[in-house]
Amino acid sequence: MLFFLKFESGFAAYNQTGGDGGKACGAYQFDYRYALLPFVKYAYETNPLVCKEFEPYAKYKSGAKLYNNTDFFKAWHQVYKRNSRTFSEMQDTFARINYYDNVERKLQSAGIDVASRSEAVKGAIFSYSIQHGQTSAVNAVKAIKPKSTTSDAKFLKKLYNYRKKSFPLYASRYTQEYKAALAELNQ
């Protein structure tokens, strides 16, 4: 399901800081304007021992102070170094809860069952939601009008074609990500 992460954060993945010009951190590129501060609070509350360097940042009222904050980036690396597995799992859980689970529920309410789809399809939807938001992901899946009889391969093709049409600036990424999704599907 997480085949798309290399397109989000590259090889640094969970330890990545300062992505998108100092705006984002982690495997999912949590952006200071949206999810970075909520993630920091979640991580610190979930495991204050592993994430002890996050204590001062978890008190922030606004994520704006995290923008291009090299002291915060050092804290991020320290947390990762202390327990990379736990910190990575926190990122996965936070992202899934905030960017995938709600999309799946909204699609189910609209009569589109993606819970029974392959991990490749779920990953493609997850990727869409991470990059463009939950509402955009839900609307994209609705727009391609998948039926229960639509194969996962066809679902992926339609979704990535829709994504390229909607966001042509990223067409090259989506072409590569589509290939990765098919590889995941065919495993």
Q: Predicted segments — roles?
A:
Residues 1-115, 120-187:
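Cell-wall polysaccharide-cleaving catalytic domain and substrate-binding groove, primarily
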